[in-house]
């Protein structure tokens, strides 16, 4: 499967205590399509009252929602990053369009201290 930055995929994402994992959506944030491993950020349908500065809320009303392939309103948690083998990706759901990618980049920059 050819993967690019901005692809929204399903992956087994580990719990923070590493006791187990659950198949969840994530967005690819790494840029090298030839790499064996990809860096992903966690996506959750458990919505915060107020999103953190490192989170982006995407709702079904948003013009970018359909292309994402997500089924529910979701929060992109750009501070929850993980490098995984691309072979662990279950399937691609959709892709962040340019507008959504720009929003995610702002949150990612804040998450890693570049903004």
Question: Which residues are covered by each model-predicted region?
Answer:
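Conserved functional hotspots at enzyme active or ligand-binding sites that engage polyanionic ligands
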Residues: 1-115
